[in-house]
């Protein structure tokens, strides 16, 4: 009788979280992880900070080596091994190694943690040297090597999402003339009102040229290297280095070919136990959908924290956890540093709330981060989204301090399905160095008849 084996496809956040949780659940289970690249167990979110020089070297992002998993946890790690085909009915995965050798691996249970891939539009000139995406460790390795060899002077970033904003700061830290080109009329598409305006002001105040409402159509070269970025209106921007940050897509090709159900978002459909539509096949991380607790809809939310937590659930259940582990879903909480600004959001934007069918409203409030008499306080701008019953639907904040942690209070309120008047009754911490007597959260949620 063949021994039970858990096979995990993908060796970064969700995949290794699944493998480790499976080991905690079943100490004697055979566990193997296959990873198509040469890198595992690293914090990709830190890549812009290595590019900027804040973090000294790429290796600082590596959390554990393959030997750690093999020797400390008896988890087999197979690098440079690409999954080619999943055969759920036969409990087999066909793989190919670097040497082009093909073989079949048996599984009792399978966890898919194939992640997401950076979108690189097939624009003219996208193959020129100096045009990059930044998603995986080897992307950072290539980009750093290019900077060291070519010594670029001017950088263009295509897209004003999270990676675009972080890379703007990284390139300015290196002294590059930096331009962000965004096809929509605002940065970070889900930010509304004055919150997004503050981000643009900060970028421009740091000598980043921000070009909104312009679509990039081509990259022009000098020889085999990028030299200019051209927009639909005919404008051209000098660039010796370009980062394309227009988003990512779920890496689901192998799952789709195996007949697994794919949702409207393009990601793998999973339930609260991280089970897919195929027996004994689980999925976790950026390749799968999850429940949005505010809208009640299945969404694709590719961020590290949900990926790890989904990995824990998938790994536990794939290893036979009793009772079954469950993933409670997301409310969509995240934060980004934009030079001196902290920018954070949770829940739905006004547009997302309206699309989800809510009769949604929004309002903004600005208040101090500390007591008025305490030195070095700054202004925090808060935008809250709610429905006509007063139910909180989302929040966005921007300021130079005290934002990234305060947003978690709103996230907790969303998890509890609270109304803004209930949130306004919270007993929050106060001391002059940390908050005014009435915290920005309480000011933003106060009844309209209060001063």
Can you name each region flagged by the protein language model?
Residues 2-75, 168-191:
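Beta1-alpha1 glycine-rich phosphate/pyrophosphate-binding loop at the start
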Residues 9, 83, 105-115, 158, ...:
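Short hydrophobic core segments
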Residues 127-150, 221, 225-230, 236-316, ...:
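FAD-site-proximal beta/loop scaffold in flavoenzymes
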Residues 28, 72, 77-98, 105, ...:
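A Rossmann-like FAD-binding core segment of flavoenzymes
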Residues 270, 284-349, 434-451:
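A conserved FAD-binding loop/helix module that cradles the flavin
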Residues 2-4, 9-13, 17, 23-28, ...:
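Flexible, glycine-rich terminal cap/loop adjacent to redox cofactors
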Residues 109-174, 209, 264, 270-272:
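Glycine-rich dinucleotide-binding loop and its adjacent helix/turn
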Residues 61-62, 154-155, 162-218, 303-307, ...:
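Rossmann-like dinucleotide-binding cores of NAD(P)H-dependent redox enzymes
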């Amino acid at each position: 009788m063949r021994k039970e084996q858990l096979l995990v496809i993908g060796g970064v956040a969700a995949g290794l979280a699944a493998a480790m949780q499976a080991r905690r659940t079943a100490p004697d289970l055979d566990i193997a992880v296959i990873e198509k690249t040469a890198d595992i167990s690293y914090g990709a979110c830190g890549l812009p900070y290595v590019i900027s020089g804040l973090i000294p070297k790429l290796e600082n992002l590596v959390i554990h080596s393959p030997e750690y998993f093999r020797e400390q946890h008896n988890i087999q790690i197979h690098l440079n091994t690409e999954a080619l085909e999943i055969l759920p009915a036969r409990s087999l995965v066909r793989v190919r190694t670097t040497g082009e050798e093909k073989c079949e691996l048996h599984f009792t249970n399978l966890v898919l943690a194939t992640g997401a891939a950076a979108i690189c539009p097939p624009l003219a000139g996208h193959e020129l040297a100096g045009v990059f995406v930044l998603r995986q460790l080897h992307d950072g390795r290539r980009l750093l090597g290019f900077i060291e060899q070519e010594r670029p002077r001017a950088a263009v970033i295509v897209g004003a999402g999270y990676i675009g904003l972080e890379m703007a700061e990284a390139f300015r830290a290196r002294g590059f003339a930096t331009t962000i080109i965004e096809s929509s009329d605002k940065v970070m598409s889900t930010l509304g009102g004055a919150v997004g305006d503050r981000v643009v002001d900060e970028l421009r105040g740091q000598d980043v040229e921000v070009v909104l409402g312009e679509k990039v159509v081509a990259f022009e070269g000098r020889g085999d290297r990028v030299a200019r970025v051209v927009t639909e209106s005919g404008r051209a921007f000098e660039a010796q280095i370009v980062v394309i940050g227009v988003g990512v897509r779920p890496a689901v090709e192998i799952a789709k070919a195996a007949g697994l159900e794919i949702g409207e978002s393009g990601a793998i459909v999973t339930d609260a136990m991280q089970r897919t539509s195929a027996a004994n096949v689980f999925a976790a991380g950026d390749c799968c959908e999850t429940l949005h607790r505010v809208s009640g809809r299945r969404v694709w939310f590719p961020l590290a924290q949900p990926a790890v937590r989904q990995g824990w659930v998938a790994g536990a259940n794939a290893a036979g956890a009793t009772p079954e582990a469950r993933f409670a879903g997301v409310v969509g909480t995240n934060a980004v540093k934009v030079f001196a600004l902290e920018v954070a959001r949770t829940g739905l934007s006004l547009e997302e709330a309206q699309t989800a069918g809510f009769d949604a409203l929004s309002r903004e409030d600005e208040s101090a981060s500390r007591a008025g008499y305490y030195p070095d306080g700054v202004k925090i701008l808060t935008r809250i989204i709610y429905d006509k019953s007063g139910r909180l639907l989302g929040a966005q904040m921007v300021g130079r301090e005290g934002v990234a942690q305060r947003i978690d209070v709103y996230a907790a309120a969303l998890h509890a399905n609270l109304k803004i008047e209930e949130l306004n009754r919270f007993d929050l911490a106060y001391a002059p160095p940390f908050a005014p007597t009435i915290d920005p959260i309480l000011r933003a949620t106060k009844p309209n008849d209060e001063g």
